């Protein structure tokens, strides 16, 4: 299971982002879950310290803290070099800093219109799911069957015939 960490200092925004993520996980039956909804960078860093798995991070840039979201991403990279970092912020002018700090962000989502933000968050989660499937040899050797309410993955070795 892939863990998702959200760091957003505004409670309303934190709940909006987490609701979009939780709904998409349920609808698509993804092997992901929100591990932490943090309001401070220190809380998130303490949680992931020593964790050696790749995770997903949704980070605000302006965290009203001594550390901004881009500096937080830089600290995350030291612990999780393969993690997926997505910035969700109102500060579009700071997008160039992701290159300066070399954090390799997957996306830079601008807050504002909830419908647009929702589409971009879902697009990020789908993109991550595809990347993980391509990176995992055992997932490549699986048959994916999508029904109305869920997706089932079956190893090709376990399939004898289709009826």
Task: Give the positions of each predicted feature.
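Conserved binding/recognition cores within well-folded domains
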Residues: 120-163
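CheY-like receiver
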Residues: 54-133
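Short helix-capping segments at alpha-helix termini
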Residues: 25-31, 80
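Acidic, metal-coordinating helix/loop segments flanking the phosphotransfer/catalytic sites
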Residues: 15-19, 33-56
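Charged phosphotransfer/docking patches of two-component systems
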Residues: 11-18, 95
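Conserved acidic carboxylate
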Residues: 8
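Structured loop/turn residues at beta-strand edges in well-structured enzyme cores
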Residues: 30, 52, 103, 154-157
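Non-catalytic signal-transmission and effector/linker regions of two-component phosphorelay proteins
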Residues: 1-5
């Amino acid at each position: 299971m892939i863990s998702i960490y959200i760091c957003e200092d505004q409670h309303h925004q934190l709940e909006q982002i987490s609701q979009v993520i939780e709904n998409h996980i349920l609808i698509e039956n993804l092997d992901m879950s929100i591990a932490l909804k943090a309001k401070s960078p220190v809380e998130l860093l303490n949680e992931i310290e020593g964790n050696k798995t790749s995770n997903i991070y949704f980070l605000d840039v302006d965290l009203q803290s001594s550390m901004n979201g881009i500096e937080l991403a830089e600290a995350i990279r030291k612990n999780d070099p393969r993690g997926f970092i997505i910035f969700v912020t109102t500060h579009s002018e700071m997008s160039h800093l992701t290159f300066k700090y070399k954090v390799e962000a997957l996306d830079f989502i601008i807050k504002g219109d909830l419908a647009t933000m929702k589409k971009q968050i879902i697009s990020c989660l789908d993109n991550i799911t595809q990347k993980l499937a391509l990176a995992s040899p055992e997932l490549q050797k699986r048959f994916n069957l999508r029904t109305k309410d869920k997706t089932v993955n079956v190893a090709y070795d376990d399939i004898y015939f289709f009826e």
